[in-house]
Curated annotation (Swiss-Prot):
Site entry: Transition state stabilizer: 161
Enzyme class: isomerase
Annotated source species: Nematostella vectensis
BP-aspect Gene Ontology terms: L-methionine salvage from methylthioadenosine
GO CC terms: cytoplasm; nucleus
MF-aspect GO terms: S-methyl-5-thioribose-1-phosphate isomerase activity
HAMAP family: Salvage_MtnA (MF_01678)
Location(s) in or outside the cell: Cytoplasm; Nucleus
Subcellular location, principal: cytoplasm
Keywords: Amino-acid biosynthesis, Cytoplasm, Isomerase, Methionine biosynthesis, Nucleus
Pathway: Amino-acid biosynthesis; L-methionine biosynthesis via salvage pathway; L-methionine from S-methyl-5-thio-alpha-D-ribose 1-phosphate: step 1/6
Matches recorded under InterPro entries: IF-2B-related, IF-M1Pi, IF_2B-like_C, Initiation_fac_2B_a/b/d, M1Pi_N, NagB/RpiA_transferase-like
Protein name, UniProt field: Methylthioribose-1-phosphate isomerase
Length: 350
């Protein structure tokens, strides 16, 4: 059974505070969009799909018992709150897509009564949870089939950051692929990176792997090339925060160098993400906004300094992996090469 990072029922939203993992499993109540914004910004919840879901559900929690005099008032309230949520972390596109989708949804309901509009909006948002899990299971299935079809099995996998149940509504994207391979009894071993400086790999991915008893080993970020050379890695799978039309992919810092190392060692490199992570407005990855975070994330651990005082710090949270380094992009609709992804997915959308 996978971890449950997001709990929602009848206007009550709780999230597993990922800042406290792996030492403490504590759920915190998110009462409104201000709580939601802070949870996203402070990385109590992280992972592009989870950011969008928690953002939307924080809106649901806020409007659940709040009265509105008119449907126009509700629509304007929703629009402003969604725009605010979208400022919490700019690189992940899933929240932007949720903002566009939900804003358009309420705009089409202005002829409804405020009560009916609210109920339809709540149903729409609440459906995002089950929809995300279904998408993740499809991603897991297609990714497992693609990797096993390409390299055979059993396989030894390498992954970066956290792309499992803690980064989504459940099951996961990149880790969902690994989970699917494990369920098929074709996983020999998985190596996960520590993922400095926030240690999502050592704190979160390792936590999930141990929780589910998946054979696994934690390695330093700087050990990936050595692991590829000596540990017989079959394939690499990572997640994505934003994918451009040509396949350029923004993901957790360190992904780019991982892809370069995989290319050198002739190891297939896969990106696993729902279609909501694809930004069809971007021709390539050059225009992706890269979030830069506090220097303290590099210079201290739990408030204790670990770097020389006065040293300059550059702390980008993401990098962009060029499409030419990516073997395939796994979505809920199948696995596509970066070159074919845009046309095939747009054809599916009709």
């Amino acid at each position: 059974m996978s971890l449950e990072a997001i709990k929602y029922k009848k206007g009550r939203l709780e999230i597993l505070n990922q800042l406290l993992l792996p030492h403490e499993s504590t759920y915190e109540v998110v009462s409104d969009t201000e709580d939601g914004w802070k949870a996203i910004r402070e990385m109590k919840v992280r992972g592009a799909p989870a950011i969008a879901i928690v953002g939307a559900l924080s809106l649901a929690a806020e409007i659940y018992s709040k009265p509105f005099a008119s449907s126009e008032e509700l629509a304007e309230f929703v629009k402003q709150k969604l725009q605010y949520l979208n400022t919490a972390r700019p690189t992940a596109v899933n929240m932007t897509n949720a903002v566009i989708e939900l804003t358009a949804f309420v705009a089409d309901l202005t002829k409804c009564s405020p009560k009916d509009m609210k109920q339809k909006l709540l149903s729409k948002i609440e459906g995002m949870l089950s929809e995300d899990i279904a998408q993740n299971k499809a991603i897991g299935k297609f990714g497992a089939e693609s990797i096993l079809g390409a390299v055979g099995g059993p396989v030894r996998m390498l992954t970066h950051c956290n792309t499992g149940s803690l980064a989504t509504a459940g099951y996961g994207t990149g880790l969902g692929v690994i989970r699917s391979i494990h369920e098929m009894k074709q996983l020999e071993h998985v190596y996960c990176t520590e993922t400095r400086p926030y240690n999502q790999g050592s704190r979160l991915t390792a936590y999930e792997l141990v929780y589910e008893k998946i054979p696994s080993t934690l390695i330093a970020d700087s050990a990936v090339s050595m692991a590829m050379k000596t540990k017989k890695i079959s394939a690499v799978v990572v997640g994505a925060d934003r994918i451009a039309c040509n396949g350029d992919t923004a993901n957790k810092i360190g992904t780019y160098q991982l892809a370069l190392a995989a290319k050198h060692h002739e190891i297939p490199f896969y990106v696993a993400a729902p279609v909501t992570s694809i930004d069809f407005s971007l021709v390539n990855g050059d225009a992706i906004v890269i979030e830069e975070r506090s220097p303290l994330e590099l210079t201290s651990v739990k408030g204790i300094p670990v770097a020389a005082s006065g040293i300059g710090v550059w702390n980008p949270a993401f990098d962009v992996t060029p499409a030419g380094l990516i073997t395939g992009i796994v979505t809920e609709h199948g696995t596509f090469s970066p070159q074919e992804m845009k046309d095939k997915l747009l054809a599916l959308k009709g």
